[in-house]
Structure formats: C-alpha cells, structure tokens
C-alpha cells in the first residue's frame, strides 16, 4: 500500500444481487488496481470494500453510481477511511 492509499466502503442498494453485480465490481476494481472485496448482505445490499489510491477509489465509486452496472442501483452510501490490513487481490464474497 502506498502512503496516499485510502479505504472505500460502499453500501450499494437496489437490485444488485443475482445479476452479476459483484463480478462486474471485481472486474472494474482490478482494472483500477484496487484490492478488496464485494459481498452480498442478507438485506439485499452489496458491500464493496476497496483499497488503493484515492483517485482509483473515486473512479470505482463513480462507476458504481454511474447507471451502467448490472441490475439496478438505487443508491450508494460511501465511507472513507485509512487502509486496514493489506488485502490480496479483489474477491467476491
């Protein structure tokens, strides 16, 4: 992790489970050089945790809210923080 790395946690609401959303998110994150995961939650949301440069995380957030995702995103609630322990790769959980 670099000195200026950040951790983005995004809670994605809408029809985002069972539509390839986590796979799509993983692909975009890897293209941006981010590490982290996308996980289905029991309440129907997807939690996205990404670590890397602020610019790359901001771009991922733009993509999550941009309207060209699988399914339908109603809203995204994001939280920014310091990177936690190193995460290897970007996984679907």
Curated annotation (Swiss-Prot):
Coiled-coil residue windows = none
GO MF terms listed in the record are:
acylphosphatase activity
- Would I find Phosphoprotein among this entry's keywords? no
What does the record give as the reaction this protein catalyses?
Answer: an acyl phosphate + H2O = a carboxylate + phosphate + H(+)
- InterPro entries on file: Acylphosphatase (IPR020456), Acylphosphatase-like_dom (IPR001792), Acylphosphatase-like_dom_sf (IPR036046), Acylphosphatase_CS (IPR017968)
Please list which residues make up the signal peptide.
none
Acylphosphatase-like domain residues are 7-93
Task: Give the EC number(s) under which this enzyme is classified.
Answer: 3.6.1.7
Q: Name one Pfam family in it.
A: Acylphosphatase
Q: Does the keyword Phosphoprotein apply?
A: no
Keywords carried by this UniProt record: Hydrolase
The active-site annotation reads: 22, 40
Q: Which family does it belong to?
A: Belongs to the acylphosphatase family.
PANTHER family associated with the record? ACYLPHOSPHATASE
Name of the protein described by the UniProt record? Acylphosphatase
Record organism: Mycolicibacterium vanbaalenii (strain DSM 7251 / JCM 13017 / BCRC 16820 / KCTC 9966 / NRRL B-24157 / PYR-1)
Gene assigned in the entry: acyP
